[in-house]
Structures are given as C-alpha cells and as structure tokens.
C-alpha cells in the first residue's frame, strides 16, 4: 500500500559514478502525474488514490472522461491508475494535486512494472529455455520439438500448465529492487540501474520496493 508514479520509458544509457565506474541505467520520464480522485471507505468502500498521467488530445476525450477530469481540475490524461493507500497517507492528498519525481531519492530501491516486449508465437526453446535435440546423427525433423507432452490412455489428456509453444511476451512484468541512480526534479526524470520491462515509449509504474531489506 504505497504511492507510486506512472512514467514513460525513454530508453537506456549509462552514467559514471564517483569512482568512474560505468553504470547502465534506464531513463524514465515521470512528468505530469495528477490526482484525479481520492477514494475513501465511506464513499467507495476502500481507500485509494486515483492518478492520471500524460496528456490526451481534446478530441480524443469523451464526455464522461472530460467531466471526471474537470471535476478534479486537472488536464485530461492518457489513462487512470489507482494506488491503495492507508487513511493516514490518503489524508495528505486531494484531487488536483501533482505528484512529482521528488518522492524518490538516490539510492532508494524501487519496483518497476510494465508490459514486456511481445515476441509473437514462439517455440519451447525460446519461450521456456528448453534444450534442442541433435542437429544430425540420426535426428530427422525433430531438432526443436518439445518431446512428450503427456501420458498414455490414463489420464488421456495434457495437464493444464504444461510448458508448450505459444504467445511469448506482451504480458505484465515487474522487475524488483532496482536502485535509483539519479533524480532530475527539474526535468522530472528518474534514472534507475538496469533494465525495465517494455519497449521505448511504453508506460511503466514505479513504486517503492516491497522487499527492502529482504
């Protein structure tokens, strides 16, 4: 139950620390996060804050969205997301507030969630890291097949969850405990160590890590 930010993956680069060591980082644009609604147990049955991010053209906003954003007094965004919060933290926020990247600090660990890159229909070698069979010496047309996928007449079926070929990627993925390397409050940029899920320009959600000290 922590507050986070929604940002845009700009790309990867590297920075140098005080010892001159090259550190690979992902640049995240965390600008324009606005509170659109504060939900309480009295009115909604649970406590959470609703946030919008980015911008949307006026001709792309329907009447329901326009009314919702106008009530909050914020510019229309690309989407809405909720963060579950305690009543104490919820009391510090109100509709129309802007949440900035300053909520993070250098050295802090964060969890980043995004939609992984889609790889299309992939076989078991690529999708599940299966080993390939021999390329020659008696092997014919079975170089990349997964092998047996079931049993005999009993049970006479393939068990659910069997690792097989299929859609690979394009799913929600989270990378945990990434270190914040730099916080650029002026340009609302966040630099985190390592790679994060998703393609360039895709949306990501950044939250304080839930496994700090673990």
UniProtKB/Swiss-Prot annotation:
<keyword id="KW-0488">Methylation</keyword>
<dbReference type="GO" id="GO:0019843">
    <property type="term" value="F:rRNA binding"/>
</dbReference>
<dbReference type="InterPro" id="IPR019926">
    <property type="entry name" value="Ribosomal_uL3_CS"/>
</dbReference>
<dbReference type="InterPro" id="IPR000597">
    <property type="entry name" value="Ribosomal_uL3"/>
</dbReference>
<dbReference type="GO" id="GO:0003735">
    <property type="term" value="F:structural constituent of ribosome"/>
</dbReference>
<dbReference type="Pfam" id="PF00297">
    <property type="entry name" value="Ribosomal_L3"/>
</dbReference>
<dbReference type="InterPro" id="IPR009000">
    <property type="entry name" value="Transl_B-barrel_sf"/>
</dbReference>
<keyword id="KW-0689">Ribosomal protein</keyword>
<dbReference type="GO" id="GO:0006412">
    <property type="term" value="P:translation"/>
</dbReference>
<feature type="region of interest" description="Disordered">
    <location>
        <begin position="131"/>
        <end position="155"/>
    </location>
</feature>
<keyword id="KW-0694">RNA-binding</keyword>
<dbReference type="InterPro" id="IPR019927">
    <property type="entry name" value="Ribosomal_uL3_bac/org-type"/>
</dbReference>
<keyword id="KW-0687">Ribonucleoprotein</keyword>
<comment type="function">
    <text>One of the primary rRNA binding proteins, it binds directly near the 3'-end of the 23S rRNA, where it nucleates assembly of the 50S subunit.</text>
</comment>
<keyword id="KW-0699">rRNA-binding</keyword>
<dbReference type="GO" id="GO:0022625">
    <property type="term" value="C:cytosolic large ribosomal subunit"/>
</dbReference>
<comment type="similarity">
    <text>Belongs to the universal ribosomal protein uL3 family.</text>
</comment>
<protein>
    <recommendedName>
        <fullName>Large ribosomal subunit protein uL3</fullName>
    </recommendedName>
</protein>
<comment type="subunit">
    <text>Part of the 50S ribosomal subunit. Forms a cluster with proteins L14 and L19.</text>
</comment>
<feature type="modified residue" description="N5-methylglutamine">
    <location>
        <position position="153"/>
    </location>
</feature>
């Amino acid at each position: 139950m922590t507050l986070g930010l929604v940002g845009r993956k700009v790309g990867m680069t590297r920075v140098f620390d005080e010892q001159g060591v090259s550190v690979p980082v992902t640049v995240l644009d965390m600008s324009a996060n606005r509170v659109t609604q504060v939900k309480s147990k009295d009115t909604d049955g649970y406590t959470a804050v609703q946030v919008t991010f980015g911008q949307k053209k006026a001709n792309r906003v329907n009447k329901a969205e326009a009314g919702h954003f106008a009530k909050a007094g914020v510019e229309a965004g690309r989407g809405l997301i909720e963060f579950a919060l305690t009543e104490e933290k919820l009391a510090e926020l109100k509709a129309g507030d802007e949440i900035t990247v300053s909520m993070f600090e250098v050295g802090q660990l964060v969890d980043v969630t995004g939609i992984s890159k889609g790889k299309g229909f992939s076989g078991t070698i690529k999708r599940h890291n299966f080993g390939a069979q021999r390329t020659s010496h008696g092997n014919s047309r079975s170089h990349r097949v997964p092998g047996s996928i079931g049993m005999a007449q009993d049970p006479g079926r393939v068990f659910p969850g069997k690792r097989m070929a299929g859609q690979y990627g394009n799913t929600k993925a989270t990378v945990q405990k990434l270190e914040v390397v730099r916080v650029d409050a002026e340009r609302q940029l966040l630099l985190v160590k390592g790679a994060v899920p998703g393609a360039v320009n895709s949306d990501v959600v950044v939250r304080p890590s839930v496994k700090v000290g673990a």
